[in-house]
Amino acid sequence: MSDLLKVQDLHMWIQTDKGLNHILQGVQLDIQPGEIHGLIGESGCGKTMMTKATLNLIDPKRTVIRGHIEFDGQELGKLPEKERRKIGGSRIGYITQDPLTALNPLYTVGEQIAEMLRYHKGMKKKEAAEEAARQLERVGIKPGAEMAKRYPHQFSGGQLQRICIAMAVCCEPKLLFADEPTTALDVTTQAQILDLLKSLQKNGLAILLITHDFGVVSEICERVSVMEKGIIVEEGLTDEIFQNPQKAYTKRLIDSAVRKEGAYE
């Protein structure tokens, strides 16, 4: 099976007041169609920056990138910027860590999902509004037509995360980047969001789950890549990594999950 996403020797430098900071140091990562792949590491290790490099969500004036990123057979670095940005949202969905930062407080959630559909799918206003309501129901926000008229502040944290998932998958992407989607949620809501992601995978969606918590990885990820200081230090099947971690850093991450009550068995 050919890889859906293939990252090879990816380097990133960010300009700071003290000079160039080498954020990503030769990252190697591949994601297969329809799999849930975990990318785990401590905060600040470069997980989010890798996804932003893939989606071109960076400041070119302050950032230098080297390496190869291939998605669905296309070398992203060779695409015009406009075409590459269109891939984000239509063929690659993205859920940020904080749903409030992804939603505009001045517009209803239905309007924001509909805008995605109009931009990427070319839908007319009425058609997009109806599809937005359907997408809300798809992620458990019901009744969709009524909820679509509400503003972000009228929803709970768990509901907002569901809405962000609806926005990320409304254009039927092949790949979803889920960046710490459960971090700010209680245990019950966290389990519901993970179940939702698993249900989306059953429809053929590949997911890169970005987290610092091995307990979350153990719940839904088939494979996992461990990142330390901008480098993938270990990669393999989740069960094998749990049972026989090769790196001390990986073992510390697993031990921290074990110490959390009920993290995994």
Question: Where are the language model's segments positioned?
Answer:
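A short, proline-enriched helix->beta-strand linker immediately N-terminal to the Walker B motif
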Residues: 170-174
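Helical segment within the ABC ATPase nucleotide-binding domain
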Residues: 191-203
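A short, surface-exposed alpha-helical micro-motif characterized by mixed small hydrophobic
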Residues: 217-219
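ABC ATPase "signature
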Residues: 235-236, 244
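Conserved ABC transporter NBD signature motif
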Residues: 63-75
